[in-house]
Amino acid sequence: MLRIAILGRPNVGKSSLFNRMCKRSLAIVNSQEGTTRDRLYGEIRGWSVPVQVIDTGGVDKDSEDHFQKHIYKQALAGANEADILLLVVDIRCGITEQDAELAKMLLPLNKPLILVANKADTFKDEHRIHELYKLGISEILAVSASHDKHIDKLLQRIKTLGNVPEVVEEFSEEEVEEEAVPSMELLSKEPLSDYEEEEIPFSTTSAPDKPLKIALIGRPNVGKSSIINGLLNEERCIIDNVPGTTRDNVDILYSHNDRSYLFIDTAGLRKMKSVKNSIEWISSSRTEKAIARADVCLLVIDAQHHLSSYDKRILSLISKHKKPHIILVNKWDLIEGVRMEHYIRDLRATDVYIGQSRILCISAATKRNLRHIFSSIDELYETVSSKVPTPVVNKTLASTLQKHHPQVINGRRLRIYYAIHKTATPFQFLLFINAKSLLTKHYECYLRNTLKSSFNLYGIPFDLEFKEKTKRTN
């Protein structure tokens, strides 16, 4: 894999260049300095080799921002990780002291280095390029990331430096399938006989060869980045006790026990009225997008605090997108005199969604139960990806009906002729019944709870679809 690192002082347009190269809006772009703090990873598609682009935070050693030492460390790690380096400067400002410091840091690495003179929006701007040779970098290219000017020349130069063969860009069959919206006839048009099995395709979007996408979500300062760093045994995300340290969604690819995971470390959601029209609001909207994108969501809460309205809001977003999830109760090392099972029992009683979730108490600080996160994710996703056999579904429902008969309404009783596990994403059962008017909310809840406990569907939002069918008579 060819790796390209983008470096520079704050507010020179690194994230705009990153988004332009990846052709996706992965990094937050804003005029406020320090928008990007962690390393962000993207990819350039359509090349003959895999290409990863690393966006780093703005380095300014003279800044009083206490995040700067962490940002510098992350930027240096990105530079060491990369094969080709892009030092981005603002051509309109000329050479600054920070630009010179960064050039001194990167030149000794003896890696292909391009000085990207960004914000060359006009012909006059481009003519100022000769001033930049004082930095001692021979490769200089003027571009405008915001106007997509000369980006193609930059990419071509990267191909040359990286010895990337030219190919005709085309989408692979795998990429086409990934973008396609599945369409299928789910139900047979033939009448359903009494307990007669129908040939109904089972729908699932699981792709075992692709990384399992895991979104870490939660309020600011609950330890999401600490959990990531603890799992990976390296500092990939900046950690601080100031809420809102992570602003971008940070994608981190990691392999464990021959399985690939793509962790998405998200910005914490905050009260909407306090973040409107700001970077934090953008981050909040990105958090919901990360939920929609994920295969499994990990909601992180602080063991020291009661479940807040914001935690419930996040959980409702997970439910809205029907995502399998696990609640991670972090900072368990700070809890004294409480048995874990009692804590979990009391937590389940606080909210209906919590009561239906899987809960794991952990400590990122001491790494207690961190490795159980992987096994919990695998178990949850295995349940989601597996079809419940039709005979098992119907045997379970038959037992359910015997234990608790539906009530009689106007001389008639609800009959369930047949049921199948219809889809995995979202998880859905299809039940064929005699009349929807005979199905009460109470009995639907009873059926839901029975299926949830019978097939261990805790942490898996699932739907019950009811379809009226007339029982075939001979």
From Swiss-Prot:
One annotated GO molecular function: GTP binding
Source taxon at top rank: Bacteria
GO biological process: ribosome biogenesis
Keyword Repeat belongs to the record: yes
InterPro entries on file: G_ENGA, GTP-bd, GTPase_Der, KH_dom-like, KH_dom-like_a/b, P-loop_NTPase, Small_GTP-bd
PROSITE patterns to which the protein is assigned, alphabetical: G_ENGA
Binding of GTP 1, residues: 8-15, 55-59, 118-121
All residue ranges annotated as the KH-like domain in the record: 386-470
Membrane spanning stretches: none
Binding site for GTP 2: 218-225, 265-269, 330-333
Role summary: GTPase that plays an essential role in the late steps of ribosome biogenesis.
Protein name: GTPase Der
Organism encoding this protein: Chlamydia caviae (strain ATCC VR-813 / DSM 19441 / 03DC25 / GPIC) (Chlamydophila caviae)
This protein's encoding gene: der
